[in-house]
Amino acid sequence: HRYDPDSGKDERIVLDGTVGFVVPAKKGGLIAGVGRCLVHLDWDSKKVTKLHEVDHGLQTRFNDGKCDPQGRIWAGTMGPPKPDIPSMKKIGSLYCLDLDGSLRTVIQEVGISNGLAWSEDGKTMYYIDSTPRQMYRFDFDGSTGKIGNKTVFIDNSGKSMPEFGLPDGMTLDTEGNAWVANFFSRKVVKYSTKTGEPMQSVEFPATRITSCCFGGKGLDELYVTTSAYEATEEEMKEFPLSGSLFRVKGLGVKGFPANVYEGSLTVQ
């Protein structure tokens, strides 16, 4: 989808596969994770070019993806979803599309690869694997794109699913705090990146909250995506707006402009 908040106009292109993420490319067009492939999409011509295919022989697909401050794309895969998500097999991986257009595997044995964010000073990377219900923090070297010193930053394993849900997509505000979409809990929760403790939550008329980012002319509006995938008939009766895009105003915080892919679009 391409949505203009001023006019309310929404355009869309239907691709051949499940779309996990989309990021702009500096050289034009968009990079998207579609099924197990990274593709380049030219919006005007609707031309789709496959750049890479991953996880050969596995039933996986790309899920969340985002660019680091240097313009690399970090994107991960997930296996087939199960009703009991914490029991899913860890057959996904986290990949990095480097500036020369090459793709490397960074982390393996991932359940549901999800939210990504980088601190304002560029020295820390945050990463969510939804299956264990955890967010991790890594030291990040922007010059090389290497990560290290993994620690568990937020751990919701064992906590109430209706209250805490599964951590999904995320973003950071300019105060350095993390806003995390929580699947199954109806909430986006703001966490302190100093203590890992929740500071604030925003509740929605939907249970499957998938991701969030700041937008608007002042980057002070929080856009929140939700899902209706595999929602029961009873759930849809209670929360008919599941699957909608929401916009939240008046939070009193701002976000950062989204990074774009700065690298090569050459097919490898």
Q: Model-predicted segments: where are they?
A:
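Beta-rich, blade/repeat-based domains predominating
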Residues: 16-31, 56-72, 91, 104-124, ...
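Conserved beta-strand positions in repeat-built beta-propeller and related beta-rich domains
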Residues: 25, 30-36, 73-85, 125-132, ...
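Short loop/turn segments immediately following beta-strands, especially the blade-tip
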Residues: 83, 138-146, 193-195, 249-255
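Loop/turn-rich, solvent-exposed surfaces of beta-rich toroidal or solenoidal domains
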Residues: 133-134, 138, 155-197
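Blade-level signature of beta-propeller repeat domains, shared across WD40, Kelch, NHL, RCC1
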Residues: 213-268
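Beta-propeller domains
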Residues: 1-15, 35-39
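A short beta-strand motif characteristic of beta-propeller blades
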Residues: 7-14, 48-55, 101-108, 150-161, ...
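A short loop-to-beta-strand structural motif that recurs across blades of beta-propeller domains
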Residues: 1, 37-39, 92-95, 134-136, ...
